[in-house]
Amino acid sequence: MGSRFVSNEQKPHVVCVPYPAQGHINPMMKVAKLLHVKGFHVTFVNTVYNHNRLLRSRGANALDGLPSFQFESIPDGLPETGVDATQDIPALSESTTKNCLVPFKKLLQRIVTREDVPPVSCIVSDGSMSFTLDVAEELGVPEIHFWTTSACGFMAYLHFYLFIEKGLCPVKDASCLTKEYLDTVIDWIPSMNNVKLKDIPSFIRTTNPNDIMLNFVVREACRTKRASAIILNTFDDLEHDIIQSMQSILPPVYPIGPLHLLVNREIEEDSEIGRMGSNLWKEETECLGWLNTKSRNSVVYVNFGSITIMTTAQLLEFAWGLAATGKEFLWVMRPDSVAGEEAVIPKEFLAETADRRMLTSWCPQEKVLSHPAVGGFLTHCGWNSTLESLSCGVPMVCWPFFAEQQTNCKFSCDEWEVGIEIGGDVKRGEVEAVVRELMDGEKGKKMREKAVEWRRLAEKATKLPCGSSVINFETIVNKVLLGKIPNT
């Protein structure tokens, strides 16, 4: 991917600032690694809370870094409790907005005075951490915003202000959240066709005009227009029309994904930089050995991501629905995946499925999805999971939880034709039916064929040296980070 820099004096210095949740940290780490390969000195800024979690999950030396790839931390402003701070997104968003600017500014002031690192020359910040813009402007350096959502999800967020102006949000009270309301056709977001209000990110469905997430999204979407450029973890063939529509209302937008494919092409897994990880949970790799014993396309992979919370009743419906399929399955079940209590599976279920299932608390998902034994994915439709599934050619059963997962579900099922949605009020009979359809049915067969085609296009986008995402990454490095472009 182009030339490398050599001496420390020449090195540009990028500061990478992810939003402090797992689904944001992982893709930012990939961007940071790719920039390091390009010759950048990297400072990666976690919150103190996540910095300490990474040390616990990956070992005491996990964040020692390299001379040219260093880790720093700033407080998130939340009180120290036994509760996982990354799970309460409204509290986390409110706190980072109010409390992170001053510590971040002090951190950069300290870095600037150091003689053993190059001067800070650019910032890559999560789009939801826009307080960093104030510091970038003060330093006079370019800042790229990395929105870790799909382009369709991001496009919806950009138009949240119009929902308020049109009186669609907030609603008077919960009784207004009717089927008729949710089926309201939204035909005024550019390049998003056949979309209903129920397909828009969940933060829009509120009764509170002071709703933290509603106002947070509106604010961050507005402030992102001050960035030098915007990058998205998607690829042009997948979301071309939406990305083109963004170009007229935002700074230059560059799709540079799927990032995991780009990283796999550029960085050796067992190299020093390749071994750097960002998982807040300890990965259990035994599942890969288990998958090695299974037939091609025979296993259902089940993972609802790092934030999804369900009730005990929902957990049981999924469990018994999966049991009824007779299929082999690998289920990632976080201990905190059930609201207010530890996830507990009935002994009867464990006994009935003993010879055809594996349960784990966290896993190396990219390796799991690319394993030939995996034939389907029961997912919450988080964007990292959706994109990884698409680029591995694996069709999905979609159970969106919150944020833009509803939008990802809509596009996965109707536009990209790789998903089947399951109702929010999950029932074991429906779980059994859709999983059987996914794995054995005619619709499932067509979805798998479509997923394989998306895999081909994802690989094409990240193929060296001329894939569209490869070229876009070169452009953001050379035109934006190494030579500030005008904010258009």
UniProtKB/Swiss-Prot annotation:
Expressed in roots and flowers. UDP-alpha-D-glucose binds at residues 306, 363-365, 380-388, 402-405. It is an enzyme of class 2 (transferase). The keyword Transport does not apply. InterPro entries: UDP_glucos_trans (IPR002213), UDP_glycos_trans_CS (IPR035595). Its EC number is 2.4.1.-. It comes from the Eukaryota. Keywords: Glycosyltransferase, Transferase. The keyword Transferase applies. CDD domains: GT1_Gtf-like (cd03784). GO terms for molecular function: glucuronosyltransferase activity; UDP-glucosyltransferase activity. Belongs to the UDP-glycosyltransferase family. This is UDP-glycosyltransferase 85A3. It comes from Arabidopsis thaliana (Mouse-ear cress). The gene is UGT85A3.
